[in-house]
Amino acid sequence: MNGNEIRKRFVAFFQQHGHTHVESSSLVPRNDPTLLFTNAGMVQFKSLFLGEERRDYSRAVSAQKCVRAGGKHNDLENVGRTARHHTFFEMLGNFSFGDYFKEEAIRLGWRFVTEDLGIDAQRLLVTVYSEDDEAYAIWTQQIGLPADKVIRIPTTDNFWSMGDTGPCGPCSEIFYDYGDTVAGGPPGSEDEDGDRFVEIWNLVFMQYDRSSDGTLTPLPKPSIDTGAGLERLASVLQGKTNNYDTDLFQPLIKAAAALAGVDDTTCSAEQLVSLRVIADHIRSVSFLIADGVLPSNEGRGYVLRRIMRRGMRHGRLLGLEQPFMHKLVETLGALMGDTYPELTAQRKTLAMVIETEEKRFAATLGTGLKHLEEAVAGLRMGDVLDGKTLFTLYDTFGFPLDLTADILRDREIGVDQEGFSACMKEQRERARAAWSGSGEASLGALYHPLLERVGASEFLGYVHESASASVVALIKNGAEVESLTAGDEGSVVCNQTPFYGESGGQVGDRGVIQLANGARFTVTDTQKPLPDLIVHHGKMVTGTVHLGDHAELQVDGATRQAIRLHHSATHLMHHALRAVLGEHVKQAGSHVSAERLRLDFSHFQGMSEEELRAVEDRVNGAILSNVSQETAVMTPQEAVAAGAMALFGEKYGDEVRVVRIGDSMELCGGTHVSRSGDMGIFHILSESAVAAGVRRLEAVCGGRARAIFRGDQEALKAAAALLKTQPNKLAEGIERLLGKQKELEKSLEKLQSAQAGGMVEALLEQAVEVGGIKLLAVEVKGVDGKALREMVDQVKDKLGSGVILLALGGDKVSLVAGVTKDLAGKRVKAGDLMAFAAAMVGGKGGGRPDMAQGGGTEVAAIPTMLTAIPGWLQEQLG
């Protein structure tokens, strides 16, 4: 049974048993800063398990894309060397959210494994947590497994928790026994790490809530989280003891072998490891890029870069000196594109990003390997490579630490992890800051109970800018109150509202809340702390508002309209960027206000003027077409199937709002124009870098764009008036002005040179003799730095033999020293003289034996410095 068939059978089986099929979520977790990547099937359901979100199903089934290559789950160093370690894998899972529990979960899992997949029950054994008598009884009494096939595990291996606190519970796992021809012992034994017994199914019984003191309190509605690795099931069903021998990997291994000119069936063990590494890594690399991650030196992008460069290095071990990984994208698309259409839809982008990174690393790989060879030349087995060298390899040659460790592994040379970490401290602190928590816990303590009590806020703002409502909650200083009085700053929650709460990058509405008694609350901001709760922040201007009061809510219409224009323009610009730059472009963040729009997007280099102009032209073309904005509500799956862009980092419920403006179609809950022509005109203000692999565009449209154009036009008119020309001939006028300036500068240089020549004769009269050598150390005025240098040359020529130091004051000190050829480097060096003189005026300098330059900041010290020069020269002459 091939991998695709197993996946289809799994989903179909649980659909037949009342489970809703939920598509795989992105590898980039939404609204979870604690995770780099989605690493388990339950990640997309975390809010359901925590009780923060409700959906219209209580049973779900999914085949989830997962990556484990950083943080707690870091399988990278073992990939390719063991039978079952992967950076990318698929987790098949069935879930119950307060629906069925242990008995049905065990029964369904056992039935699917033994009946639908046809795995021999005699080959299976299970584990339970040692204190979970309920699960043990179900397995032995209801399923009918003999006691020697149910192993009690006392360790935390069979007790799962989401974190230090929160939902947790015991686990039960199903293991497949490959037989005594494969080394290894059963789970719980000393040699359990062997390959004979492989876990193919894990049932997590979430039945407790762990408090901060460790107390376990039974959950009112226990849940089920099940995980089964597709790659492991494929190995069992295809009679393989190694996942890489299944149909999920073999086409990729053979394609890589063909590129390297080796036979994967007869090659050496180390060559086979390299082929397996490449097959695994092209999967994770391609899926990560397809989900919007680009190579960088921080966060997710850095993990991607590590994986890519490890794959490239193994290609080099196979003799692949030129970029090759990008050529495997086609094979991967043919293998998995039917299930994951993003692989085929983005194949050109995937290949381009991978090849660009391959070329970038190839430029330093050879030099870096040579540096590494030199560094380990004197090391023996058991020695450790120092952290400074490791950091140099990382910082200069782009070698991630684990890549260097992987290279040294075969030589049995270790790495100085602590030393490397010390060198990396500053960079790591920056990366860690990017993954710090979001501070949502304190908000949850206030808003979750409030939402439970008052219910969802109904949003009326798509149609109305004013509405009547009831006040259902009041907040002051972070706590609920009964009333707000004049002068109080606080928050108002109503049962319904036309005010848009900030979300999806769109700022919240402003306006007023008026009460029948004349009281007035000014809304300065509107937030959406939870998906169904809208909170109006502001200040009580007059009167008092009480819980239960009837209120009239009025949005600031002019501000709302300006925000509408910019939000719709953001959609059009996002679509234009993908058309101009490529489908790898994905929104990484946005900010839409009445003043302007800002869009952060994934792209690996700065945009050219031609690209910026093309994007601007496309958006303005869509505006001129004056098409209607269309809105529809559908499931996320239906929306994506229809071609809508889902923005990763946004959380979507069971139904989503799809906004179409011309060719642009996105999942969006924001407010938009009725027709594209309402935006008037669009103008890009700036393009810049935000972080590695992320660019930022700022733009305006409508009235704001017209105001900027008007301001620019007025500035052009004013500049043209100064030059006494027309605005359309301003460039010519500036060219003429610059030409005149250049001519004047040349004339000034000639005058200064002539002046300097005249000054030289006077300076020569100030020369003195020190130890039989002529010395001229004086301050000059009225010249620039260039003239000062010319004067030193002229003095040297006329002096014949001697030492010169000229000082120029002003805002700072400029110094030039000269020594004639007969003395330079023999008895006196200009560089030494400059070091002495510059230090005395609070600066530094240096140069050749015959000429040196320098300067300082202490202008007042010039006379003292000049007085000290004869003594310095006498010391030099001895």
From Swiss-Prot:
Task: Write down the EC number.
Answer: 6.1.1.7
- Coiled coil (UniProt feature): none
User: Per its UniProt record, what Pfam families does this chain match?
Assistant: DHHA1 (PF02272), tRNA-synt_2c (PF01411), tRNA_SAD (PF07973)
Question: What InterPro entries does this protein's entry cite?
Answer: aa-tRNA-synth_II/BPL/LPL, Ala-tRNA-lgiase_IIc, Ala-tRNA-ligase_IIc_anticod-bd, Ala-tRNA-synth_IIc_core, Ala-tRNA-synth_IIc_N, Ala-tRNA_ligase, Ala_tRNA_ligase_euk/bac, DHHA1_dom
What does the entry list as the binding residues for Zn(2+)?
H567, H571, C668, H672
The subcellular location is: Cytoplasm
Q: Where is the signal peptide?
A: none
Identify which cofactors the protein needs according to its UniProt entry: Zn(2+)
Q: What is known of its domains?
A: Consists of three domains; the N-terminal catalytic domain, the editing domain and the C-terminal C-Ala domain. The editing domain removes incorrectly charged amino acids, while the C-Ala domain, along with tRNA(Ala), serves as a bridge to cooperatively bring together the editing and aminoacylation centers thus stimulating deacylation of misacylated tRNAs.
- Function comment: Catalyzes the attachment of alanine to tRNA(Ala) in a two-step reaction: alanine is first activated by ATP to form Ala-AMP and then transferred to the acceptor end of tRNA(Ala). Also edits incorrectly charged Ser-tRNA(Ala) and Gly-tRNA(Ala) via its editing domain.
Query: What name does the UniProt record give this protein?
Result: Alanine--tRNA ligase
User: What organism is the protein native to?
Assistant: Magnetococcus marinus (strain ATCC BAA-1437 / JCM 17883 / MC-1)
